[in-house]
Amino acid sequence: MASHALLRGVPVALVDGTNRFDAYYIAEFARKVTSQRLVKQRVPPEQLLRQIYVARAFTCYQMEATITERLPAFLRNAGAPIAIIFGLLDTFYDEQAPLFEVQASVGRIITALHRLKADNIAVLLASLDMKLESKERNRLFPRVSSAMDHVLEAVESESGYHFIKEMPGHPDLITETGRMH
């Protein structure tokens, strides 16, 4: 989704809750599509990098403010139709944040994500389903995934990665959707 948008000159907003986004990957992607002649003309890495707007959140409070306030305003002003969010819940697993605040914050984020969808913004959440000591915080991922339209799990096998589609709210309904090598 994002790579095709970037190649067409469409801006993409990226929120990084993992602090692992690597801009060099985008530059490598540009070199790869150019060298394999997957595009009609050379795509300079700088061109793609100018179209990605990155916001990092280091605490759950920053993540909530970014998703509920800053991201919608930015998307509107920039005319960006795509938002990618890495590690939405990573900062919420911090035991320093009181659970009642975390749960309320996640609810506000889900509402904000639904508003983005209503505004025709494509949103991709990429998160790990982590197993934590806290049973209550382990419920955050299922809560978010059950509020999404589509949930895909990337599963590694000998032939590469393939995606398993889970039906939100119905984890027992699973279909294989495709392979990525």
Kindly give the residue locations of the regions a language model identified.
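Conserved catalytic network of the ASCE P-loop NTPase/AAA+ motor domain
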Residues: 4-7, 44-47, 74-78, 115-119
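Loop/turn-to-beta-strand initiation segments
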Residues: 11, 51, 79-83, 118-128
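Conserved P-loop
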Residues: 1-65
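A short acidic (Asp/Glu
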Residues: 24-26, 95-97, 135-137
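Short, ordered loop/turn segments at secondary-structure junctions
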Residues: 17-19, 88, 128-129
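Localized chelating/binding microdomains
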Residues: 6, 29-33, 39-44, 90, ...
